Amino acid sequence: MDPYAFSDEAWCKELGRRLDHLREDRKMSRVELGEEIGVSQPTIRRLLDEGHGKLSILVAALRSLEALDQFETFIKPPPVNPALLRKKQVRRVEVG
């Protein structure tokens, strides 16, 4: 499957669909999810059915569904540059 063959809107809807499937797997209702993350049912509907919503709501939903670990596969963290790491360690020693 070519991921670039789909529109941004199609990907947003797919993300909402996958999040809704995860919610069902956790045996959590939409009402429970909304209450747990502090958003209204229209907001949950827009997120799960249409793929529209703020990133902060997406992160809160992933946390509520105990799925934040899946975020690592969504966007991989950048590799650590050993030279920069040493430089930061030296600064901590100098400042500390």
Predicted regions and their residues:
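Short basic helix-loop element that most often maps to the first helix and adjoining turn
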Residues: R17-L33, R91-G96
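Short alpha-helical DNA-recognition segment
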Residues: K27-R45
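Helix-turn-helix DNA-binding elements, focusing on the entry/boundary residues of the two helices
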Residues: L19, R30, Q41, L55-L58
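Short acidic/histidine-centered micro-motifs embedded in hydrophobic/aromatic stretches
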Residues: E36, A61, F74-P78
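Short, basic-rich loop-to-helix N-cap that marks the start of a DNA-contacting helix
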Residues: E50-R63
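Short, charged recognition helix plus adjacent turn
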Residues: E72-G96
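A short, Lys/Arg-rich alpha-helix, primarily the initiator
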Residues: M1-D25, F74
